[in-house]
Structures are given as C-alpha cells and as structure tokens.
C-alpha cells in the first residue's frame, strides 16, 4: 500500500532540526514523503519503485520514501527504512533554515546562493562546546548493544540490486580512528559481510 503524505499545513517548517526524526517530519509536512506499508525486496520491488520515482520526478524532484515493513531474505522485517531523505531539491537548504518555498527546482545556482547566504547570516561557524548530559536523557542511544549482542543483520539493510554481492548500508556515515593517521569521517556505501563486519 502506497500513500502520499498530505500537506499538513502551509507554514514553512525550516531547520535546523534536533534529530533526523524532526527533519523527516518537516519534509512530510510539505507533502514530500511517500509512505509504503510493506514491500517485497526479495522481488526487488523497492528498487523498482525508486527507479520509477526517479524516472518520473528526476534526481532532484523525487520525494523521500519511508517503508514500514520489508521482506529481506525470505523474512518480513520491521522498519522504518528511509530512502532519498536528502535527494529532493531544497531539503538540505531547508535543514539550515531556508524556507522550502524559496527553493526553485532546477535552478541549482540560485539555490546554492540562497543556502550559502543563509549560512553566512549565521556568522562564523565555530566548534560547539561539548555538553555532558545524563545517559537517561540522551536523545540517542535508546538501545545500546555491545560485543556479541551486536548483529548488523538484524537491521533492515537491503540488497539494492540483483548484481550486488549482498546487503549494503547505502550512503552510510562512517567515523574511523587510526592510531597513527587520525580520524576520518565520510559517507560510504558499505557491504555487510557478517553480524559484526562491514567493508
């Protein structure tokens, strides 16, 4: 079942946001989210659906998609799975405070300048002091798994295409620390190679 989210109100809901949940709620408020109750990825239904969206709306016009339940390797797995959350023109600019109705689809230079001007209005970008809060009040780490409790295969990551060599974390944010080389932060497509191994 596919349902296009209805525009909840006409107010501009702009960032910055406290969490990915708040960001997705703002996108949904603008009617730019399609919710899918369940889909069979063993038959590559999600892959086909996303390609059809891109064909119809283009790379910068396709809405975000939230899948509530998905079939992976013969089993139905609860989501949500979020796809294309940053793909639609204007969403990233909206996240830094540019109202979505000021974003012009297809006018990338205009949109870039609009977002850049908004960043400049914010002044110098300086490091934010670390604030320590009690673990019970943390907005993340609702579930903490350690050592053998960790099983990446429990998460609804999918094999996106038939030619893939397995399931992948697509556009995952990866932070690594090397004792000699230091820290690296990047966005990568990472293959899941086991319960506690990605590469």
Where are these regions (language model features)?
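Extended, highly charged
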Residues: 2-199
């Amino acid at each position: 079942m596919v349902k296009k989210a209805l525009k909840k109100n006409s107010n501009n809901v702009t960032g910055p946001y406290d969490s990915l949940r708040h960001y997705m709620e703002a996108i949904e408020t603008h009617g730019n989210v399609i919710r899918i109750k369940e889909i069979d990825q063993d038959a590559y239904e999600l892959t086909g659906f996303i390609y059809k969206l891109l064909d119809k709306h283009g790379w910068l016009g396709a809405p975000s998609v939230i899948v509530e339940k998905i079939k992976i390797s013969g089993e139905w797995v609860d989501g949500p799975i979020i796809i294309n959350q940053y793909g639609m023109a204007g969403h990233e600019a909206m996240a830094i405070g540019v109202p979505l109705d000021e974003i012009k689809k297809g006018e990338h230079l205009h949109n870039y300048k609009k977002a850049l001007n908004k960043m400049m209005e914010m002044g110098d970008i300086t490091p934010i002091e670390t604030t320590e809060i009690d673990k019970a009040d943390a907005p993340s780490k609702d579930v903490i798994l350690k050592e053998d409790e960790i099983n990446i295969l429990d998460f609804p990551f999918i094999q996106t295409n038939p030619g893939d060599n397995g399931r992948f974390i697509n556009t995952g944010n990866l932070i690594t620390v090397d004792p000699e080389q230091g820290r690296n932060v990047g966005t990568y497509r990472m293959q899941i190679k086991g319960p506690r191994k990605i590469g």
